[in-house]
């Protein structure tokens, strides 16, 4: 049974983090809608993966299908026009002079959250959920707790609303994110995240590792692999299976 009285909108990309957050929300809210974005990303694979996850997640736990609401996809191609990044253009993945990786898309999460709030406003939804994290992350400033708290204030002032921005992964390591998936949906949910979610910056979907699909060498794959290895090792110490 949901533990929160209300509906939620999850910013859902089809990646590990947002998939885990979707399961978290389905356990807590009466109806959980989703929103995704075409922002000019180089690879369409993540948009296909989000559809695969949405098609399968309702069968993970009894009741999840009944709580899953509508899905909205918004076009945000302006990010390709604003400048080159490794996620929107064919450029090398490397650290920039400002200390941020070339995969950083300036303003992306801020724009996503603003668009999600506008969508939620029209649907009478108060709770916004997204999978940003300040622990195991690439250093993106728009993933930090301070940025999310500031956005909640700005959105509530600008729309005269009482939105609550939920960031369930904010202080979790990637290993703890795998633990959350197991806690929220059991081993079936862990398997769904492994098989259907997408993380790889290079869009590789034809190479399967123990931790899922990907090139295995980009920063996103390395982080996902390290988290999975720590998760498996932690459960092995306690004599548990995956």
Curated annotation (Swiss-Prot):
It comes from the Bacteria. Zn(2+) binds at residues 200, 215, 218, 221. SUPFAM superfamilies: Adenine nucleotide alpha hydrolases-like. Its EC number is 6.3.4.20. ATP binds at residues 12-22. It catalyses: 7-carboxy-7-deazaguanine + NH4(+) + ATP = 7-cyano-7-deazaguanine + ADP + phosphate + H2O + H(+). Its cofactor is Zn(2+). The keyword Transmembrane helix does not apply. GO terms for molecular function: ATP binding; ligase activity, forming carbon-nitrogen bonds; zinc ion binding. Keywords: ATP-binding, Ligase, Metal-binding, Nucleotide-binding, Queuosine biosynthesis, Zinc. Pfam families: QueC. One of its GO terms (biological process) is queuosine biosynthetic process. Binds 1 zinc ion per subunit. Pathway: Purine metabolism; 7-cyano-7-deazaguanine biosynthesis. Belongs to the QueC family. Catalyzes the ATP-dependent conversion of 7-carboxy-7-deazaguanine (CDG) to 7-cyano-7-deazaguanine (preQ(0)). NCBIfam families: 7-cyano-7-deazaguanine synthase QueC. This is 7-cyano-7-deazaguanine synthase. It comes from Nitratidesulfovibrio vulgaris (strain ATCC 29579 / DSM 644 / CCUG 34227 / NCIMB 8303 / VKM B-1760 / Hildenborough).
